[in-house]
Amino acid sequence: EKTEIDTRKEFQNKINEFPYDFSEVKGQETAKRAMEVAAAGGHNIILVGPPGSGKTMLAKRVPSILPPLTMKEALETTKIHSVAGKMGSNTSLMTVRPFRSPHHTISDVALVGGGTYPQPGEISLAHNGVLFLDELPEFKRAVLEVMRQPLEDREVTISRARFSVNYPSSFMLVASMNPSPSGYFPDDPNNTSSQTEMQRYMNKLSGPLLDRIDIHIEVQKVEFEQLAEKRKGESSIEIRDRVLKAREIQAKRYKELDINYNAQMGPKEIEKYCDLDS
């Protein structure tokens, strides 16, 4: 006898169990709106702000406003995690979008994949989900540079002498960084970072890499009055409802194309759908 399971409902229930919620973030309305726009279009985003401004809190809550996995996405994600040996003993199917947050000491092989028998790296384990790189300039520049091509192609090819392996890597990149080595520029009157140190700090990130990050948003420090407020902000469910509506509009727009959301558009689609004001 056949058993029918409404996987869409199952995935929806799983995302509602997410441990973090946007209502827990005090203030930062502009940054929250930027996160919503990024989630709606699948755009990469970088948060620039001082320590304690809530950059990591915001990033960890992005999966809670993303649409539930489709069955196709769930199977793709499950295959990758299974190949990497990352599936739990009691898990047969990935039902929530992955959130990967590697440490800044990670090697290039661990990030993009590799080894004698090529294994998926963090960018593939984040496929259909979120890759969070906290304190982006602390990563080795060479490690970040190998991520440029996968960001563009949404897949990574690992070549060996006798064969090559392709792993998908269509993820939403969320990055964060301080505005200066000391972390508090320009508000710190005793800023200890020299112009040379500031330039060296910013030079850790190449122009081509930053070009692949669609949204750059400044996150201001939250004043005590805002932190002390009892009123909660919008919940992740409320924000996700708007994200879902935006994704539905995009699905209709691109129904004849192999595109699901705005971030996947190429030059032809941009010319057709993005009528820029003069």
Where do the model's predicted regions map?
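Peripheral, non-AAA+ core regions of ATP-driven protein-machinery
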Residues: E1-I46, S53, S159
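Conserved alpha-helical scaffold flanking the Walker A/P-loop in AAA+ ATPase domains
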Residues: E36, S92-P98, D108-L131, S164
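Basic, amphipathic alpha-helical bundle interface domains used for macromolecular binding and assembly
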Residues: P118, R141-V146, P150-S278
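Walker A/P-loop
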Residues: I46-G88, D153
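Active-site phosphate-binding and catalytic loops of NTP-dependent enzymes
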Residues: T3-D6, L47, T70-K72, G85-N90, ...
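Walker B catalytic acidic pair
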Residues: N128, D134-L136, V146
